[in-house]
Structure formats: C-alpha cells, structure tokens
C-alpha cells in the first residue's frame, strides 16, 4: 500500500492541506489479492442476474467485505484523507481474449466478457458508498460504458475521441451528483490519459474566492442527458422534461462550498456560466477556468486499473485521441457513488437506484 506522508485521517478539514507530490492515493494488489478479488466477482456474476438488479444492489456492500483485507483497509483510510483527488487500485487481471472486442456503442456493451469486471467495480464501490444511475443517461444503467462511438468524435460527451473531453464535475448541474466517480479500465492500448485538477486555492485572491462561494453561477446539464443520446424507447420519459427545465431555467448555485481551506468544487468547463449581467461572477469564473486549465495533470489508467475520482474535490476530463474502430479501442466501465443515498430520495425513479430529474 502506498500512502502519502501528508495524509490526514480525520473527519474535519485541516486548517491547511499540504499537497502531496502525487495528487492521488494509490494501492497495488498482490497477485494473490487480485486473484481473490476476481474470483469473488466471478461468483457474483454467476449468482446474480445483473449488476443493477435489486438483490445485488442490496448485497454488494456486504459482499465487498470479503475483498482482501489490505485493500479494504486502504479504501477505508484513503476516503477520510483530506487531499487525494482520486483513489487508484492497480493490478486487477483482465483476460484480453476473454474480454472480446470493444463494442461499437454503449448499447451493446453488456458483454459476457466484461460482465465479471462490472461486478468487480460494483464490489469496490461498495467500500465507498451506494451506487446509482440516471434515468436520462445510457437508458438508466447503473454501470455505464465509456468508449468511442463513430460519428461522435467531436461531441461534448465521453463517447468523443478526437476532441478533448473538457474538465468537469460529474453531473455538476444536480444537487444529487455523485461523491465519487468510479472508472475501471478494460482496455487502453494507446495510454489515453484522464485529466484531473483540484481547487487552485493558492492562486485565488480573497475576493475571487468570496465570489465563488456565492450563489451567482448557472450550471446546465451536459449533453449525455439529452434524449438524442439515449435509446428511442426512452424518448417519451418524463425525466427528460426535468433535464430540459434544468437547461432552460437553471437555479443560481455556488461553485465552491464547505470549508474555506478545503472546499468542495462544483463546476463544468463547458456548461457553467455566470448569472446574467453579473460581471464580477464572470470574472471570477474566468479566473478559475484559467487556473484549472493551467493545473490539469494526467492519470493514465492501464488495463485493469480502477480509479475512484473524488467528485467533490476534483474535476476530470480526458485527452483527445485517435479512435481505432477496430475492436481495440479504449473502453472503461463507469459508476456513480454517493455517501448518502437518502439525499436523493425524492429524485428516485420509482423504488430503484435510478434517479429522475423532477
């Protein structure tokens, strides 16, 4: 287990948070630990129908405590630290031949070869909180897929490729956004980097910081929640009306919240704007954009690596790359995790883990 000497194991933010050399906390499984975790996931794949079935959603956090103890210790401690932008677990085995080709679309990405790995990601997530999905994103799947789609190379969603995916808080528009975003790399032959950045506190003057803590900013839903990016069967769902309302009439929010020395961040580089006519807010947002652009760093997830990005402390994106469309493209499984599922209770689409935007 690798831990920074500057970690803080406490619930309250420190008066000042030292920045470690590496802005994420990393753990490497031994071969025996990796085999044990994979075997546990394989048993789940045999026992349960699907990762988002109600029985497995309830059982996963309990089964997760059968994962190797050293891994559980790392996750329990790292999630309390004040500084890491992400928790990274390396060393999970992926049988590339058994995995099969990278699908051409997320609709066909629930493949037999990737099924045990989806269960593995769910088990890891169970050590951090409860998973959920969006009714307006990839047809309400809890485990979603990140892969390039032909024709979408220059879009503003994760299925883009030739265009860089801009930095963002995941689902920044919603008060029910994830606390963690989990990514499991099934395949990344070209070493395409995930980008991350935290709050550039050292470079923000006091007045700009004051403004960013005030509800003077508008954040609209990103394009992944649009009807056009979901199946035709989803077109009439009432949840899309809520997305349209959030896009047309967003409520002013603060970009920074919480402890001033270790604030939580809520921003989307492509979908955030100042309130109309608010020049001071526009200047503050412009300053923040420039500082985040300048502080972006890269995290490459190799095959089998898992990252849990702290969606409260860091924004993330992805570098541009040349898609192959030959069955060997970059492919990740993705999941949303909340520390408090009841926070979003009124947005549940029925008795499920799928959120609708009311």
UniProtKB/Swiss-Prot annotation:
Keywords: Antibiotic biosynthesis, Iron, Membrane, Metal-binding, Oxidoreductase, Transmembrane, Transmembrane helix. Fe cation binds at residues 168, 170, 316. Its cofactor is Fe cation. It is found in: Membrane. GO terms for molecular function: 2-oxoglutarate, L-arginine oxygenase (succinate-forming) activity; 2-oxoglutarate-dependent dioxygenase activity; iron ion binding. 2-oxoglutarate binds at residues 194, 330, 334. InterPro entries: Alpha-KG_dependent_hydroxylase, Arginine_beta-hydroxylase, Clavaminate_syn-like, TauD-like_sf, TauD/TfdA-like. Pfam families: TauD. Pathway: Antibiotic biosynthesis. It is an enzyme of class 1 (oxidoreductase). It is a single-pass membrane protein. It catalyses: L-arginine + 2-oxoglutarate + O2 = (2S,3S)-hydroxyarginine + succinate + CO2. GO terms for biological process: antibiotic biosynthetic process. Residues 1-21 are annotated as: Disordered. Involved in the biosynthesis of capreomycidine, an unusual amino acid used by non-ribosomal peptide synthases (NRPS) to make the tuberactinomycin class of peptide antibiotics such as viomycin and capreomycin. Catalyzes the stereospecific hydroxylation of the C3 of (2S)-arginine to generate (3S)-hydroxy-(2S)-arginine. Usually clavaminic acid synthase-like oxygenases catalyze the formation of threo diastereomers, however VioC produces the erythro diastereomer of beta-carbon-hydroxylated L-arginine. This is Alpha-ketoglutarate-dependent L-arginine hydroxylase. It comes from Streptomyces vinaceus.
